[in-house]
Structure formats: C-alpha cells, structure tokens
Amino acid sequence: MIVGLGNDLIDIRRIERMLVRYGDRFVQRIFTDIEQNKSESLQKKSSSYAKRFAAKEACAKALGTGIACGVNWKDMGVINLPSGKPIMKLTNRAQMQLQKLLPLHHDAIIHLSMTDDFPWAQAFIIIEALPRG
C-alpha cells in the first residue's frame, strides 16, 4: 500500500548560485557527509547536489511534513548502492515521521528516482508499506 508520494523539480542553476554564494556553509547545512563525498567526486557537482536536494524535498512531501514542519535536511540522505541505484536513508525526525505513516505490523520501502537534464533536476519518492513476514 502506498502511504506517501512526493516529487520535486528544481533548476540546477539555483543550486549553482547557492554553491557560489554560500559555498561550504550551504553544503554542510543541507547534505550528509555521504552526499557531499559523492557530489564532490563528480565533474557535474551542481547537478548531483540538485538531484539530492530535489530528493530531500520530494521525501519531505511524501512524509507529509515538508521541510518547515520538523524534518531536518540532514534527516534524509541519498545513498547509492554498489549497483548505483539511489536509495533514501532516513534518520531522527524523518524516521519518526515515517513510522507514524505506517499501519501496525508494516515495514516501509522508500522508492527513489532521480534525473537531470540541464537546467532541470527532478526526483520522485514513493513510500510503500508492506506487511511484515
């Protein structure tokens, strides 16, 4: 059963401007260490950061809170599996909010899709509740 759905579309140039204007302060405030390491290792840093920013926005929407209602940017982090597939890892308040969405005796699966085509980056999140066992 789907318990959450979110999407976000962002202009990569907006992230480029934030990186130029605020630099490391912006990166440290928004992105986890894993996200920073991944993005900094790529030639197109701004596209990578933009996709991850969009994924966080989409996740906050899927959780039903948005960013302003208690879920912190760093409570959500994109991790790439060895296959390259991106997944969303939740901690702290985001994890607590996820648990509130789940019916009794269900576990969550978070599906994440990210894409970019300059100047746009986009992410979709589907939160699925599956019965345990």
UniProtKB/Swiss-Prot annotation:
Gene3D superfamilies (alphabetical): 4'-phosphopantetheinyl transferase domain
GO biological process: fatty acid biosynthetic process
Database matches in InterPro entries: 4-PPantetheinyl_Trfase_dom, 4-PPantetheinyl_Trfase_dom_sf, ACPS, Ppantetheine-prot_Trfase_dom
Sites where the protein binds Mg(2+): 8, 57
This protein's GO CC annotations: cytoplasm
Annotated organism of origin: Bartonella quintana (strain Toulouse) (Rochalimaea quintana)
Family the UniProt entry places it in: Belongs to the P-Pant transferase superfamily. AcpS family.
Full protein name: Holo-[acyl-carrier-protein] synthase
Alphabetical keyword list: Cytoplasm, Fatty acid biosynthesis, Fatty acid metabolism, Lipid biosynthesis, Lipid metabolism, Magnesium, Metal-binding, Transferase
